[in-house]
Amino acid sequence: MNHLIVTVGDSFSGRKFDLEVPKDVESEKLLDDILETLRGYAPELQWRISEVALWDRRLGRMLKPGETLEEAGVWNGDTLYLAQK
């Protein structure tokens, strides 16, 4: 399986979205894609990639720039939060 289903939460508004994401894309590219997708669901969420990072609840850490979900150890069903850098 080349994709994971993750819940992406906006830690500021409390909203959550389930998304299917590729596990082999670097976290910064994935974050940019997630922000673009969330703007379609919730236009009021106007986060810039320079302001936020992806934080994995189960792992208890931010994903590193250049790290893929697979390299980070993100599992299917994990919750990723948009967290302020």
Regions found by a protein language model. Give the residues of each.
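Ubiquitin system architectures
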Residues: M1-K85
